[in-house]
Regions:
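Sec-dependent bacterial lipoprotein signal peptides
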Residues: 1-21
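Sequence signature of WD/YWTD-type beta-propeller architectures
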Residues: 2, 21-181
Length: 181
């Protein structure tokens, strides 16, 4: 009996997902051994596209540690993210704003998990959970980069948090006491 299997790389997944959206106009993005392009021989994961499809943010092990990369789909090249990635730091779960200016991600640079927003224009990082107790994960940034939502266990269970970067404060989210059957 013959066994058939299908292995999809990030490029393969991107091709399948976006192929239908672009009416069959596929991007042909080769794998590069040293990682100068979108795909490398290292593990690539957690892809997120900007609203207009111009930018793709993802995580890769290509430098020998988990790092965040930004790919310009129109130019078909990686873009630099100065000051974002450093050896020995775990950074993952990226989310990108609609215009590609802001990247929210989870970092363990301070010995605990934090949600950080990187501004590509100013090259600055804002740790929005610096004073929070507990773990945080799975950030998602709004299209304009003002709001960041993520999971937090600071109340003793995993809950959804919403942070407003405009006023630099979490939005109060009252627990819902309803149960659903």
């Amino acid at each position: 009996m013959l066994k058939h299997s299908v292995n999809l790389s990030l490029y393969g997944l991107l091709l399948v997902v976006l192929g239908g959206c672009w009416g069959g106009n596929y991007l042909l993005l080769p794998t590069e051994p040293l990682g100068g392009g979108l795909n490398s021989l290292a593990r690539e994961e957690s892809p997120q596209l900007s609203y207009d499809g111009r930018y793709l943010v993802f995580v890769s092990d290509r430098p020998g540690y988990r790092a965040i990369f930004l790919f310009d789909v129109a130019q078909r090249q990686l873009l630099p993210l100065p000051g974002l990635n450093r050896p020995g730091m775990v950074q993952d779960q990226p989310s990108i704003s609609g215009d590609g200016r802001y990247i929210a991600f989870r970092s363990e640079a301070r010995g605990k998990s934090d949600i950080v927003v990187y501004d590509r224009l100013t090259r600055q990082q804002e740790i929005i959970t610096a004073t929070w107790q507990g773990e945080v994960q799975f950030p998602a940034i709004s299209g304009d980069g003002r709001f960041v939502t993520f999971q937090s266990d600071r109340s003793g269970q995993w809950n959804i948090e919403i942070y407003d970067r405009g006023v630099r404060s979490p939005l109060p989210v009252a627990p819902n006491r309803q149960t659903f059957n």
